[in-house]
């Protein structure tokens, strides 16, 4: 199964080659496939902030490589690189404050610097750590795909119709994807007949990115207006909603793309199972509940500009990027460390316990 999944992988959004970071500019998809070459940390921070790269895991990976570029700059300057590098840690951390993976990756890079041996090549060590973060995320996604498909198999009566929202695919990760990884695996196993994708306003990650990823791999996908998703659940025989996560609190509350919360409410009303697929790096046990997760808001122009024209110029705008889905609306959280059905604080703590062997 794992070999089949790897062979089916066609989309990637992050490349590290000869000391340069290349990011597929997701703002331009699907009309243009343009790669950004990032040569310094300022360019990486801007790419994260401006959503050229997006998705919690992808942001963390890009930030890790950004620190490698930052260190290279600081060493060339010849000053106190350790003190100067703190500015770069801060600029990357502030780029997208909701993504738990971003802070996890930055903390892991900081920890690697603190474990340097006497005489060790600091730049080589940090680059190796960034590459390891990238590769481990892809491996985690492959594991989650297999675990998620076993859940779908357990409840399968016939080929199923799945609904996804936002973009939790290869573009949002180190490869293969989280929610879309499960969907890809289900299609390869003959268990997924059709995927419905919500358009995901206002950035249209569903229509621009998810539909593009699935269509590229020959997976039948139907795009739906966000306002049609409740009707879709009622009329089209949806069996699972499968989404990703940007941050998971200690009690199992999940911050994800704005609109996910109302999707979960509708799923419960219609008896549709709700699955969250995310690496354990998205879990922050320091956040007791979803109320503690910082939720980013973006510029009003994203809602007020249409085809270059300002609409409703006199109104105020509420434009949150994420919302929080309470744990009691979630049937299962799938991570590479294991599967949690009906998540709560005790189950999350057990999953993340350092004494676990797997």
Curated annotation (Swiss-Prot):
Keywords, in A-Z order: Amino-acid biosynthesis, Isomerase, Methionine biosynthesis
Pfam families: IF-2B
One Gene Ontology MF term: S-methyl-5-thioribose-1-phosphate isomerase activity
Enzyme type, top EC level: isomerase
GO BP annotations, alphabetical order: L-methionine salvage from methylthioadenosine
HAMAP family xref list: Salvage_MtnA (MF_01678)
Name of the molecule in the record: Methylthioribose-1-phosphate isomerase
